[in-house]
From Swiss-Prot:
Annotated S-S bridges: none
Protein known as: UPF0337 protein BCE_1081
Region (Disordered): 1-28
Taxonomic path: Bacteria, Bacillati, Bacillota, Bacilli, Bacillales
Bias (Basic and acidic residues) ranges: 12-28
Length: 65
């Protein structure tokens, strides 16, 4: 598995965990948990996008060889 794909998957998992935490924080009115979920969701989104860029770069380099 390429680094880019692995990072995309890790990002999606982290983003999903963040969404769940944010939702639970919303329902339970736990601001700290809600904010923690938002932060995890943001980190996951960034990881996912970085993984996509890495994958495109890797694919581009593979095509040149």
């Amino acid at each position: 598995m390429s680094g880019g794909l692995k990072e995309q998957i890790t990002g999606k998992v982290e983003k999903t965990k963040g969404q769940v935490k944010e939702g639970i924080g919303e329902v339970t009115e736990d601001r700290e948990l809600k904010n923690e979920g938002k932060w995890e969701k943001t980190k996951g989104t960034i990881k996912e996008k970085v993984g996509k860029v890495k994958q495109k770069i890797s694919d581009g380099l593979d095509n040149k060889e």
